């Protein structure tokens, strides 16, 4: 039999400037896979390329792993010195790695959901290219099973691990249902946009303002919502349940007195303020106003760090699940070694006149080989010896029965 193996680079072993040179687009992957199968000793191969990893999952690589790595570097027109960044895993260790990747336990952010879709896409491309077969089909199926178990039986994806999503989680704690909540996004910072987009997905009503009106209009097209003029910001402030501030201003654009007026007009209904700007755009004193819940980027990062610690604990539980699934897979994989022996045993009796003794022996031999494939060769040799001596055994049995019958 061949061997399951993994070769590649990821964020743990190679910097981004190396990973980006090896990265393959969808169209590139479609071209690379047939070349790898045709020009290296591979029976099956798939390639997973994301921003954090470029990994080849393969079967029947029985020669030096450098053959594959050299071919990949040749395709990407890279210097052989890049080989030093590659890692190689074989057999059970390779299967565990694939399952771990698909379960997001090997991700930079443990529990992130994107990797499952990326793994499925990598398999789809390989299947369409005709470069996967019996072994990698099974690896894929069981990797997804492992991934599902990890997500449903642990809490790796329950808590927010991005600053933007942490802001949304805090907003939900304060307001409960976010449907119909009015959100004001001030500025065009990336994290602010992400937080606003998350809130919109939960049904919040989005309002956007920016010093540059055209930029606000552009954001409205991307996120949907209403545009407010920046100079009217303080007039609209009391109407907003959630305020996200993410501008490039060097000083405070909202001060304590702005929120004192705002909560009075809101009759002290809670107002959630997220200041993701660096330097901060909201006077920290605003957090002391009754009804105002002010969080800056450090507050959110603290939430994220606590959540990450919790995910790491859950990941340890996930690894136990992975090893359980790897063991099941390896039992199936090892059983494949016995298939030729089982077929040979079956062929020895099918369509032939054989004694019940031989039939019983074949049945027992097959059962034992399935239970322990390592002994298949020995069992087959013993069976052939018994089968060869079967005529002599019959003759002796007849003589014995004749003597006793006389």
Swiss-Prot record:
Pfam families: GlutR_N, Shikimate_DH. It catalyses: (S)-4-amino-5-oxopentanoate + tRNA(Glu) + NADP(+) = L-glutamyl-tRNA(Glu) + NADPH + H(+). InterPro entries: 4pyrrol_synth_GluRdtase (IPR000343), 4pyrrol_synth_GluRdtase_N (IPR015895), GluRdtase_CS (IPR018214), GluRdtase_N_sf (IPR036343), NAD(P)-bd_dom_sf (IPR036291), Shikm_DH/Glu-tRNA_Rdtase (IPR006151). GO terms for biological process: protoporphyrinogen IX biosynthetic process from glutamate. The record marks 97 as: Important for activity. Its EC number is 1.2.1.70. Substrate binds at residues 50-53, 107, 112-114, 118. It is an enzyme of class 1 (oxidoreductase). Pathway: Porphyrin-containing compound metabolism; protoporphyrin-IX biosynthesis; 5-aminolevulinate from L-glutamyl-tRNA(Glu): step 1/2. The active site is at residue 51. NADP(+) binds at residues 187-192. GO terms for molecular function: glutamyl-tRNA reductase activity; NADP binding. Keywords: NADP, Oxidoreductase, Porphyrin biosynthesis. Gene3D superfamilies: Glutamyl-tRNA reductase, N-terminal domain, NAD(P)-binding Rossmann-like Domain. The keyword Transcription regulation does not apply. PROSITE patterns: GLUTR (PS00747). CDD domains: NAD_bind_Glutamyl_tRNA_reduct. NCBIfam families: hemA. Catalyzes the NADPH-dependent reduction of glutamyl-tRNA(Glu) to glutamate 1-semialdehyde (GSA). During catalysis, the active site Cys acts as a nucleophile attacking the alpha-carbonyl group of tRNA-bound glutamate with the formation of a thioester intermediate between enzyme and glutamate, and the concomitant release of tRNA(Glu). The thioester intermediate is finally reduced by direct hydride transfer from NADPH, to form the product GSA. Possesses an unusual extended V-shaped dimeric structure with each monomer consisting of three distinct domains arranged along a curved 'spinal' alpha-helix. The N-terminal catalytic domain specifically recognizes the glutamate moiety of the substrate. The second domain is the NADPH-binding domain, and the third C-terminal domain is responsible for dimerization. Belongs to the glutamyl-tRNA reductase family. PANTHER family: GLUTAMYL-TRNA REDUCTASE. Homodimer. This is Glutamyl-tRNA reductase. The lineage of its organism: Bacteria, Pseudomonadati, Aquificota, Aquificia, Aquificales. The gene is hemA.
């Amino acid at each position: 039999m061949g061997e399951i193996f993994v070769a590649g680079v990821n964020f743990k072993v190679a910097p981004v400037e190396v990973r980006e040179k090896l990265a393959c687009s969808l169209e590139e992957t479609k071209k690379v896979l047939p070349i790898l199968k045709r020009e290296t000793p591979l029976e099956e191969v798939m390639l997973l390329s994301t921003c954090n990893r470029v990994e080849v999952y393969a079967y029947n690589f029985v020669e030096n792993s450098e053959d594959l790595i050299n071919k990949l570097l040749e395709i990407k027109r890279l210097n052989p010195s890049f080989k030093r960044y590659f890692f190689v895993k074989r057999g059970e260790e390779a299967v565990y790695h694939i399952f771990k990747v698909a379960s997001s336990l090997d991700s930079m952010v443990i529990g992130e959901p994107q990797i499952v879709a990326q793994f499925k896409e990598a398999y789809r491309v390989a299947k369409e290219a005709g470069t996967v077969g019996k072994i990698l089909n099974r690896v894929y199926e069981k990797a997804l099973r492992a991934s599902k178990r990890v997500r449903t039986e642990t809490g790796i994806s329950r808590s927010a691990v991005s600053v933007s999503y942490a802001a949304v989680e805090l907003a939900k704690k304060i307001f409960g249902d976010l449907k119909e909540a009015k959100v004001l996004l001030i500025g065009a910072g990336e994290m602010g946009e992400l937080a606003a987009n998350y809130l919109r997905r939960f049904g919040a009503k989005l309002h956007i303002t920016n010093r540059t009106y055209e930029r606000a209009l552009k954001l409205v097209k991307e996120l949907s919502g209403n545009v407010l003029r920046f100079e009217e910001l303080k007039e609209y402030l009391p109407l907003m349940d959630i305020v996200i501030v993410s501008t490039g201003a060097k000083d405070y654009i909202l001060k304590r007195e702005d929120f004192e007026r705002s909560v009075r007009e809101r009759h002290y209904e809670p107002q959630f303020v997220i200041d993701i700007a660096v330097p901060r755009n909201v006077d920290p004193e605003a957090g002391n106003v009754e009804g105002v819940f002010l969080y800056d980027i450090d507050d959110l990062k603290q939430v994220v760090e606590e959540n990450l610690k919790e995910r790491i604990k859950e990941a340890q539980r996930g690894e136990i699940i992975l090893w359980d699934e790897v063991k099941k897979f390896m039992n199936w994989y090892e059983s494949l070694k016995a298939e030729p022996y089982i077929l040979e045993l079956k062929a020895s009796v099918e369509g032939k006149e054989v004694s019940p003794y031989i039939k019983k022996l074949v049945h027992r031999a097959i059962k034992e080989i399935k239970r322990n494939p390592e002994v298949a060769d020995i069992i087959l040799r013993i069976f052939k010896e018994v089968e060869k001596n079967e005529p002599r055994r019959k003759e002796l049995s007849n003589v014995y029965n004749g003597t006793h019958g006389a």
